[in-house]
Amino acid sequence: MNNPINFKEKFSKFEDLWSPRVIAEMNDYQFKLVKIKGEFVTHNHEDTDEVFIVIEGSMKIQFEDRVIELKSGEMVVVKKGEKHRPFAVSYTH
């Protein structure tokens, strides 16, 4: 169905940190929402790129050669195979 998906409503349905929830699927891709605070492990994805979009708050992503910051309304594409470690000092989604 072509019904709008309300992010605020979807975020209100869970509290777990670092536990992505699938909200839609398209072709071979899943759209996920996640709440974060603190650090995640350094990792990579061998088969696919990964997109981070910040709806509220801010986060950083550490790469091997730099650290970037994403603020509310910003996004970044992490290329497949690129090692990265996402983290957020305060509650972010």
Language model: regions and residue ranges:
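Conserved short histidine dyad/triad with adjacent acidic residue
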Residues: 30-46
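Short beta-strand His + acidic residue motifs that chelate non-heme Fe in jelly-roll/DSBH
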Residues: 43, 61-62, 78, 83-89
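Short, conserved beta-strand element in jelly-roll/cupin
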Residues: 36, 46-60
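A short, N-terminal "cap"/entry segment at the start of jelly-roll beta-barrel domains
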Residues: 1-32
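Conserved small/polar residues in nucleotide/adenosyl-binding loops
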Residues: 92-93
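A cytosolic small-molecule/anion-sensing beta-strand core signal
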Residues: 27, 55-56, 72
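Short strand-coil-strand connectors
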Residues: 27, 62-66
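Short acidic-glycine-tyrosine-enriched beta hairpin
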Residues: 65-80
